From Swiss-Prot:
One of its GO terms (cellular component) is membrane. Keywords: Membrane, Receptor, Transmembrane, Transmembrane helix. Belongs to the MS4A family. It comes from Mus musculus. May be involved in signal transduction as a component of a multimeric receptor complex. This is Membrane-spanning 4-domains subfamily A member 13. It is found in: Membrane. The keyword Transmembrane applies.
Length: 203
């Protein structure tokens, strides 16, 4: 039994991987731009603008998109079970990263405290960059989710079920074997107690 999805071909998966790499590189470049932008601020009366996304380095998480995209491209050419499982795990990680990064960006854009007038322009530009990055997160989420769903077309589910059944049988056999050992040990203890009682009675 296999989950087949003929609409997603190897060429389409390669395109998805390339788009992931491009998104990841763009995020890393934007992180470098924001780093230079915020480091160039001047400490005034109202301080500098340092949002939570800058402190957490969420744009730098684009490296995960680059790595996932590279594995996706390679998995499209070499469709081995281990490669597909590894790539699917990375894409699931990217889904989690996009959700967290988008949440932090929304928190940043929903609050804006007063900053020094000298840093207002930099803060405004940084928030615009965050808005652009926020628009790219749904695209990365959709790509990672699409690959995670379509990758089941290359995974033999019957072998996975068989391996799970085999592991379950081994665990149950081990538990039964331990129970038999405990019962045998209990019987031996009872035998020793009865022999001891007989010896004491004869004495």
């Amino acid at each position: 039994m296999e989950c087949r999805n003929p609409k997603v071909s190897s060429a389409n998966i390669t395109v998805l991987g390339v788009i992931q790499i491009m998104i990841g590189i763009y995020h890393v470049l934007m992180w470098y731009f924001l780093l230079l932008l915020y480091m160039g601020q001047i400490k005034g009366v109202f301080g500098t603008y340092e949002p939570v996304t800058y402190k957490m380095g969420t744009s730098l998480w684009g490296f995960a998109f680059v790595i996932s995209g590279a594995f996706t491209v390679k998995a499209a050419k070499y469709q081995s079970r281990h490669m597909i499982l590894c790539t699917m795990s990375l894409n699931i990680l990217c889904i989690i990263i996009t959700i967290v990064a988008a949440s932090l960006t929304i928190v940043e854009l929903s609050h804006f405290r007063s900053v020094s007038y000298r840093n207002y322009g930099q803060a405004k530009l940084g928030r615009e960059v965050s808005r652009v990055l926020l628009c790219s997160y749904p695209l990365e989420f959709a790509i990672a989710l699409l690959y995670s769903i379509s990758s089941c077309a290359y995974l033999p589910l019957s072998s996975i079920v068989k391996s799970l059944v085999r592991k379950t049988w081994r665990l149950s056999s081990l538990a039964a074997w331990r129970q038999m050992i405990w019962l045998e040990a209990g019987n031996q203890e009872e035998t020793l107690e009865s022999v001891t009682e007989v010896v004491e009675g004869n004495s």
